[in-house]
């Protein structure tokens, strides 16, 4: 409450108002029609300080000669120069592209395209502003008269007159705005509005702000700071419709107003229950464009979404998703499933951009609405060719984030990209390569697809200086798919780029650099280019091990697995939990077997020492005989293991077991074991033979596979590929087998682990 009350205190601000200045040449020379000099002679050329530009016609058929003025209009930051007016016009793209065909597909008006929902309910007109609404164009003679009055009367102008002048001038045809903004008289009008700003009521302020939008006032002008401050004072005296309208006008103007929104959000914390459906949707849109919002407010708005969810249309559903996504605000799984259900009911009528917005939110919340994704897979291949590459990127990225491999979608993406790859940003190239690599999928046109994207990386190299994370994403995505463009790798691992990535990117990229470096070391033995320095390698490896170790040891199922393996093999010295390949960011359980396929006590970290000389190991392993295995593998368990073993080896389990049953005794160490009763033997570590087999036991979970399948994702598939390359045999304890077995008896678990370890060793 105290935080909210602080916002009620008046904000201190200064409205710098210089005395009204004389402007002998301040009035623009507004001329009517086709006026020519006496005698029909053409006008002589003006000098560089005041030249006639080409004439442009207004709607009424009159023309205004465009002039530039020598007098300064820098009061209050009113630098209405050519560059600023051009920039202002780009912030309000309201003209369609003259191009056609492929170009039209890539042209998306991100401003108007996200405001379609405002046209679908009449209620939105109460709290939004539509610049396309037509005004009766003002005559050039009236413009000239207004500007003359501004110059002549100056300080005698009343606030309501100033407001009226702005309103009338805002009806000027858009193509003549730059002429008006170049006028010293208009600069004087703006100065007078600032000087009298405390005399304007809320309606006046809103009217002037509308005029600023219509006239495309450059959003960077310092004059607008004064207006933001004044609106901050007015927040608690305004209605919800007025507040939303003001916020929408700032959005139309293209200016960020963080102070206004801070107070506006405080107001909403007290009045959020009063929001109507149209107000709620419009507010979520505005929040998304603002990018920042208190999360407690978003939680309140989520409850209102549930209240209105059955009344929203499809475009409003897309607006909800985009607003929450842009503001990095999550929605509950329940709400996301409701949204998915709404979309599924009308999937064919869903616009492509709304589809993209919904997928963004599914990606952000990691909600797997399978029915939605199935329907998406049916319509996406037809939509993708007519969707811009940025939209295609978001569709592809959503599939990879949700681990859903739909070959129809991926093939459509791969087929559509090569002809228009030049339209990709560096971000698009990176995310698409990452997505295909993550899903471990190679489309039918693999060669064309990858060669076009790799060539585009070359063309985008200057962009990577600004966005180094995108180059690393490209290269790691390519590595998942076994592509290693050494030219780019050499750049990415160069000292200069490493420094750039660590200093200039907003992301922590050390892990990405480490992953790329470790991958190159294994998979590119002939590579002679740049590598990370040893200090950075060791530091990153230690950090990753701390994270991986903490994560795995927080999982009870992993701890039980580790304990059972230690029991089966003979103690902690026979198994080691560590990161065999630190750059792959996950840990392993390593077991080493000698020439007789018996475990070796190689883990010195878990071995007690006596006087630093000999290492003594206690054999506490379990001898698994055929009789014991028969007792364990009865009923359902027996059928399960028998089916799995026959499937994987093609041999009946009893025949295989005769080959693989290994009594854990006499492996160079004397001693005999009983179940739970062992004797101690001496095994000097220095006399141990090199291991014949090194096993990397993988404790997996569902997030390492494509959804609903047993196909590994890119990083985990790459890790196994590299483990094999450095001489390990991978033993997988798949979650679909091992996790259900954890509920069974201890002996059944030991039997399963014995089969896995020693069958893999063959």
From Swiss-Prot:
InterPro entries: FAST_2, FAST_kinase, FAST_Leu-rich, RAP
A Pfam family per the record: RAP
Key words of the record: Acetylation, Mitochondrion, Mitochondrion nucleoid, mRNA processing, Phosphoprotein, RNA-binding, rRNA-binding, Transit peptide
Keyword presence, Acetylation: yes
A GO term from the CC aspect: mitochondrion
GO biological process: mitochondrial RNA processing; mRNA processing; regulation of mitochondrial mRNA stability
Chain positions found as Phosphoserine: 95
Subcellular location as annotated: Mitochondrion matrix, Mitochondrion nucleoid
Membrane found in the keyword field: no
Molecular function terms from GO: rRNA binding
Tissue: Expression detected in spleen, testis, colon, heart, smooth muscle, kidney, brain, lung, liver, brown and white adipose tissue.
UniProt domain RAP: residue ranges: 695-755
Positions of modified residues (N6-acetyllysine): 506
Family indicated by similarity: Belongs to the FAST kinase family.
Role according to the record: Plays an important role in the processing of non-canonical mitochondrial mRNA precursors.
Known partners and oligomeric status: Found in a complex with GRSF1, DDX28, DHX30 and FASTKD2. Associates with the 12S mitochondrial rRNA (12S mt-rRNA).
Protein name (Swiss-Prot/TrEMBL): FAST kinase domain-containing protein 5, mitochondrial
Originating species: Mus musculus (Mouse)
């Amino acid at each position: 409450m105290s935080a909210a009350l602080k916002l009620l205190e008046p904000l201190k601000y200064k409205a710098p108002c210089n005395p009204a200045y004389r402007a002998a040449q301040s009035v623009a020379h507004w001329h009517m029609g086709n006026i020519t000099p006496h005698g029909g002679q053409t006008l002589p050329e003006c000098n560089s300080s005041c030249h006639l530009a080409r004439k442009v016609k207004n709607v009424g058929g009159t023309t205004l000669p465009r002039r530039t003025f020598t007098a300064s209009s820098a009061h209050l930051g009113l630098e209405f120069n050519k560059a600023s007016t051009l920039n202002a016009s780009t912030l309000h793209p309201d003209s369609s592209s003259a191009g056609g065909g492929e170009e039209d597909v890539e042209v998306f008006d991100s401003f108007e395209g996200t405001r379609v929902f405002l046209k679908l309910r009449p209620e939105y007109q109460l709290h939004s502003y539509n610049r396309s609404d037509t005004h009766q164009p003002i005559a050039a003679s009236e413009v000239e008269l207004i500007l003359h009055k501004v110059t002549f009367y100056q300080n005698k102008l009343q606030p309501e007159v100033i407001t009226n002048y702005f309103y009338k001038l805002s009806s000027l045809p858009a193509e003549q705005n730059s002429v008006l903004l170049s006028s010293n008289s208009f600069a004087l009008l703006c100065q007078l509005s600032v000087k009298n700003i405390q005399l304007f009521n809320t309606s006046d302020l809103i009217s002037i702000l509308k005029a600023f939008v219509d006239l495309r006032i450059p959003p960077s002008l310092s004059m607008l700071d004064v207006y933001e401050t004044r609106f901050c004072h007015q927040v608690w005296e305004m209605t919800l419709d007025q507040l939303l309208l003001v916020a929408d006008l700032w959005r139309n103007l293209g200016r960020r107003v963080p102070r206004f929104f801070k107070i506006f959000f405080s107001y909403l914390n007290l009045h959020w229950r009063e929001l109507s459906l149209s107000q709620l949707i419009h507010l979520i849109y505005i929040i998304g464009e603002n990018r920042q919002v208190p999360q407690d407010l978003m939680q309140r708005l989520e409850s209102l979404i549930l209240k209105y969810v059955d009344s929203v249309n499809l475009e409003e559903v897309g607006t909800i998703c985009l607003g929450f996504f842009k503001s990095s605000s999550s929605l509950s799984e329940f709400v996301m499933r409701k949204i998915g259900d709404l979309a599924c009911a009308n999937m064919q009528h869903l616009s492509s951009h709304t589809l993209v917005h919904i997928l963004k939110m599914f990606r952000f919340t990691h909600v797997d609405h399978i029915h939605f994704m199935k329907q998406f897979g049916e319509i996406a291949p037809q939509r993708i060719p007519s969707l811009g590459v940025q939209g295609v990127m978001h569709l592809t990225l959503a599939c990879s984030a949700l681990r859903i491999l739909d070959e129809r979608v991926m093939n459509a993406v791969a087929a559509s990209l090569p002809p228009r790859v030049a339209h990709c940003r560096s971000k698009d190239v990176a995310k698409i390569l990452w997505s295909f690599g993550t899903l471990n999928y190679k489309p039918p046109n693999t060669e064309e697809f990858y060669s076009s994207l790799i060539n585009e990386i070359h063309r985008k190299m200057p962009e990577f200086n600004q966005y180094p994370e995108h180059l690393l994403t490209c290269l790691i995505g390519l590595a998942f798919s076994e592509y290693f463009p050494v030219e780019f790798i050499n750049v990415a691992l160069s000292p200069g780029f490493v420094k750039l990535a660590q200093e200039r990117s907003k992301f922590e990229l050390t892990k990405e650099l480490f992953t790329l470096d470790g991958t190159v070391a294994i998979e590119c033995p002939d590579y002679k280019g740049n590598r990370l320095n040893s200090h950075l390698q060791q530091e990153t490896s230690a950090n990753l091990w701390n994270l991986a170790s903490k994560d795995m040891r927080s999982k009870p199922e992993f701890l039980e697995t580790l304990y059972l393996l230690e029991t089966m093999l003979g103690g902690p010295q026979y198994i080691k939990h560590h990161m065999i390949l630190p750059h792959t960011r996950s840990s392993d359980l390593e077991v080493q077997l000698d020439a007789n396929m018996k475990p070796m006590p190689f883990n010195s970290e878990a071995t007690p020492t006596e006087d630093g000389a000999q290492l003594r190991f206690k054999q506490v392993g379990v001898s698994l005989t055929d009789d014991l295995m028969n007792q364990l593998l009865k009923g359902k368990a027996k059928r399960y293991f028998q089916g799995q073993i026959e499937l994987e080896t093609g041999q009946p389990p009893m025949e295989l077991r005769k080959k693989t049953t290994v009594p854990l005794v006499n492996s160079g160490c004397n001693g005999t074991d009983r179940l739970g009763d062992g004797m101690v033997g001496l095994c000097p570590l220095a006399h141990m033979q090199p291991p014949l087999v090194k096993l990397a036991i993988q404790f997996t979970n569902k997030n390492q596979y494509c959804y609903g399948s047993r196909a590994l994702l890119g990083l985990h598939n790459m890790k196994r590929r590299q483990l094999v390359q450095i001489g390990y045999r991978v033993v997988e304890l798949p979650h679909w087998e091992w996790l259900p077995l954890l509920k069974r008896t201890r002996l059944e678990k030991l039997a399963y682990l014995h089969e896995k370890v020693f069958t893999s060793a063959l």
